[in-house]
Design a protein with these regions (language model features):
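Hydrophobic membrane-targeting alpha-helices
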Residues: 27-32, 118
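Active-site signature of cysteine proteases
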Residues: 34-39, 218-423
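Active-site nucleophile-adjacent alpha helix/oxyanion-hole segment immediately C-terminal to the catalytic cysteine
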Residues: 86-282, 286-293, 297-309, 380, ...
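Short, Lys/Arg-enriched N-terminal segments with co-localized hydrophobic residues
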Residues: 1-10
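Bacterial N-terminal signal peptides
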Residues: 19-29
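Bacterial N-terminal signal peptides that target proteins for export
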Residues: 9-20
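N-terminal regions that are enriched for targeting/export leaders
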Residues: 39-93
Length: 423
């Protein structure tokens, strides 16, 4: 004998049957209307589309630091498919890499390298320019601002490429052999003693509240002359005696043609403003701010047009390896498909991305699925691996960790036009 079914139970069973029937109808309708080919649906497929299908391994690596060692978390590069040689790239004319050694002069090495490439692009004779000449006068101008601002100005070895350009406009340039900054038979740059003395002098000046600019700059120049030598007032060029500014004019470089770009949400896009990093010690507001896709596209576009590009990058990263000459973003940081304006800005505002090095981009390589960039680098890490003086940056590294670039205005004419249209 079957138990009697109540009216409520009967209605409940009827509801279940109707729900199942509706589910079947929706399932077959979706199958009939949906695409017939296999598509990137679901978490796993979406992960592949976003470059996260293969996870990078994180390992601890011992690195030399002074007389000792430190342990740092780095990416395991053994399985990385990467370029092995600059010959794999479409290369633009540039002079061989030069080491900056124990100095903070990367900003000047990168800018000088760009201008040397520009001379070659313009059909001028190959010319090695002096980095130390520009650095000398940068120290003078840093001291001048420190005095004028009553000590409220950054004192560091770093600077930005547009500051190097400003110093050349102000003081001119000379050739490398005309001013090496190397005394007493030295062959490697070392500014450690120079910078210590420079900083101590200015900090003592601040403590004494002595703001006599003329006296301070005379003392600063004496310190610079002691460590680097006195820069020449005139140089001999083919039998003619020229000042550094006259020599700059003779090169045919218009330094007003070089423009700098950033990509940050703290400024309205397609406007100019300040690049908010300590190395922009003079608070320049000459930076063009553009959306990230335009920013990244402008760098590759410039290279394709034959213009090299100076980059300001964060190199203190687990995906940056001198031993393998590469810069990439590992998946344990962020899958590359998720790199966007917000993730870039987030790392900048919390200090995870810092502007700690300037390099010179001199080529590119497009090979599915990646684009790689050939980087001429003056820092010591670029001399640890099999390829001396170069790095290979993958596009994701450029997108997330390159915070500023500078190039010739003709390389980015279309982008500059957007600024004219918005004003």
């Amino acid at each position: 004998m079957q138990p009697e079914i109540s009216k409520g139970e009967s209605m409940k069973r009827t509801g279940i049957i109707l729900s199942l029937a509706l589910s079947l109808v929706l399932f077959f309708a979706a199958a009939a209307c949906g695409p017939k080919e296999k598509t990137a649906e679901g978490p796993r497929a979406r992960g592949k589309a976003l470059g996260a299908s293969v996870k990078d391994e994180a390992v601890y690596v011992a690195e030399k630091r002074g007389e000792g060692e430190i342990s740092r978390l780095k990416m395991n590069f053994s399985a990385l498919d990467r370029p092995k040689s600059p010959e794999e790239f479409i290369r633009l004319p540039h002079l061989p890499p030069v080491r900056q050694y124990n100095t903070g002069m990367c900003w000047c090495f990168g800018t000088i390298s760009l201008l040397e490439s520009e001379l070659k692009r313009l059909g001028k004779p190959e010319t090695k320019l002096s980095e130390e000449f520009t650095v000398y006068w940068e120290y003078v101008e840093k001291a001048r601002r420190f005095i004028r601002e009553k000590g409220n100005s950054v004192l560091g070895e770093g600077s930005e490429p547009n500051s190097a350009i400003a110093r050349m406009k102000q003081y001119g340039v000379v050739r490398g052999p005309d001013y090496t900054g190397l005394l007493d038979g030295k062959t490697e740059h070392d500014h450690s003693a120079l910078f210590r003395e420079f900083r101590r002098f200015l900090e003592a000046y601040k403590a004494g509240q002595d703001w006599n600019e003329e006296k301070a700059l005379a003392a600063v120049r004496a310190i610079l002359n002691k460590h680097l030598g006195k820069p020449p007032d005139r140089i001999d060029i083919d039998g003619k005696s020229l000042t550094p500014k006259e020599y700059l004019d003779s090169l045919g470089l218009n330094l007003d043609d070089y423009v700098s770009f950033i990509s940050f949400k703290y400024l309205p896009f397609h406007t100019r403003g300040e690049y908010k990093v300590p190395d922009n010690w003079w608070h320049s507001t000459d930076y063009y701010n553009v959306p990230l896709d335009e920013y990244k596209g402008a760098i590759l576009g410039a290279l394709k047009k034959g213009f090299t590009v100076v980059l300001a990058a964060d190199i203190s990263e687990p995906g940056n390896s001198g031993e393998t000459n590469v810069g990439v973003i590992p998946t344990f940081d962020i899958p590359r498909g998720f790199i966007d304006q917000a993730s870039r800005e987030f790392r900048f505002t919390n200090g995870a991305s810092t502007d700690d090095h300037v390099v010179h981009c001199v080529g590119y390589k497009k090979s599915a699925p990646d684009t790689w960039f050939l980087i001429k680098d003056s820092w010591e890490t670029a001399y640890r691996g099999p390829v001396k003086g170069y790095f290979f940056y993958r596009a994701d590294y450029l997108k997330l960790k390159v915070l500023m670039f500078m190039t010739h205005k003709d390389a980015v004419a279309g982008l500059l036009a957007k600024f004219q249209a918005s004003n």
